[in-house]
Structures are given as structure tokens and as C-alpha cells.
């Protein structure tokens, strides 16, 4: 049994297989998951697990190039958006490098998820609480 870090075997395996610029999406309970994209469904009930908790777990193991968010997230769910930005800023400081944040319209965000290697569904009930991580390289 794994003792630390990311305990979900499917998610840990997907992250270990990512190459430079591969995409991994973490989403709220309502984001449609395109046919053909692997679904890792962690949702148990409302808020369990939370979007932020899953984001933090992914950040423990994934090297990042950038992230993508929906523009609407800033206005519709500003508290959760600000919490996420704070997490990303802390992670950026720990890594000693910027994590660029790209914003797109939600309709385009959903279209872009078709390119994700996998989509991780959380129990989050906050509108637009979705993020796509673009994999970086460790060297």
C-alpha cells in the first residue's frame, strides 16, 4: 500500500504517463466528459472530494507547463477562483517558477477537454470549478 502522496492508483498512473504538454482536467460534478476521454470519477457526494483538495493532490505529483481555466470562473464563482489562484501562487513560489494561467470561454474550455488524457470528476458543486493542467518536464 502506498503511504504518501496521491493514493488513487488510476490518477497516479495517468500522471506518471503524461508527456510534455499532455493535458489532465480536474472538474466539478457537472462538467460533461467527452466520449473517448478517460474518466476518473472520484465524486462521492456533494463536496466530497472538493475541487481544491484534488487540485492540491495533483500538484503534489505533476510537473506543470501551464493551466487553463474558464473566464466565467472569475465572475460566477469568484471565491473558489480566488482560492484556486492562491493555491497556484503558493505552488509557483515553492517551485521557484511561474505557472501561467490561460483563460478561455467556457464553451471553448469544454471543447478543449476532448484533448485531455483523462478528466478527474470531483464532488464539487461550484459552477465553473474546472482546471486543465498542461504537463511540463522536470528538466
Curated annotation (Swiss-Prot):
Gene3D superfamilies xref list: RbsD-like domain (3.40.1650.10)
Any one of the GO CC terms: cytosol
Molecular function terms, GO-annotated: D-ribose pyranase activity; intramolecular lyase activity; monosaccharide binding
Chain sites annotated for binding substrate: 28, 106, 128-130
Enzyme class of the recorded protein, top EC level: isomerase
Catalytic activity: beta-D-ribopyranose = beta-D-ribofuranose
Broad class of the protein's primary localization: cytoplasm
InterPro entries: D-ribose_pyranase, RbsD-like_sf, RbsD_FucU
Alphabetic keyword roster: Carbohydrate metabolism, Cytoplasm, Isomerase
Localization (cell): Cytoplasm
Oligomer status and interactors: Homodecamer.
Reported function: Catalyzes the interconversion of beta-pyran and beta-furan forms of D-ribose.
Stated name of the protein: D-ribose pyranase
